[in-house]
Amino acid sequence: MKIKIDESYLSKLEQLALIRLKNEEKDKISNDLQRIIDFFEKINELELKDVEPLFHPISSGKLRKDEPLKPLNRDEALQNVKRKENGYIVGPRTYGE
């Protein structure tokens, strides 16, 4: 089924997204959406009947064995820290002044 992004379809998308587009935005978005839809239609045309589905793109994992290392002591951990205070790392404020 060929989907065509026309004025009514775009208007419905505006309502669903709760947005209002300007006319110049409508033209650009309409063209972009049509290109995306066309791309997915090309994907749908692929013959995949004999292709076995993959659960992961890499068939065999090459994982390294976990080996515990000696933990850093406090001085080593704070060695490259820009801001520290009383043996703790001081990070940037994320809330308030």
Swiss-Prot record:
Disulfide bond sites: none
Pfam families named among the record's database cross-references: GatC
Role according to the record: Allows the formation of correctly charged Asn-tRNA(Asn) or Gln-tRNA(Gln) through the transamidation of misacylated Asp-tRNA(Asn) or Glu-tRNA(Gln) in organisms which lack either or both of asparaginyl-tRNA or glutaminyl-tRNA synthetases. The reaction takes place in the presence of glutamine and ATP through an activated phospho-Asp-tRNA(Asn) or phospho-Glu-tRNA(Gln).
Listed EC numbers: 6.3.5.-
Name of the protein in its database record: Aspartyl/glutamyl-tRNA(Asn/Gln) amidotransferase subunit C
Domain of life of the native organism: Archaea
Molecular-function GO term, any one: ATP binding
InterPro entries documented for this protein: Asp/Glu-ADT_sf_sub_c (IPR036113), GatC (IPR003837)
Keyword Nucleotide-binding: yes
GO biological process, alphabetically ordered: glutaminyl-tRNAGln biosynthesis via transamidation; regulation of translational fidelity; translation
Transmembrane segments: none
Family that this chain belongs to: Belongs to the GatC family.
Gene3D superfamilies xref list: Glu-tRNAGln amidotransferase C subunit, N-terminal domain (1.10.20.60)
Reaction(s) the record says it catalyses: L-glutamyl-tRNA(Gln) + L-glutamine + ATP + H2O = L-glutaminyl-tRNA(Gln) + L-glutamate + ADP + phosphate + H(+); L-aspartyl-tRNA(Asn) + L-glutamine + ATP + H2O = L-asparaginyl-tRNA(Asn) + L-glutamate + ADP + phosphate + 2 H(+)
Subunit annotation: Heterotrimer of A, B and C subunits.
Keywords associated with the record: ATP-binding, Ligase, Nucleotide-binding, Protein biosynthesis
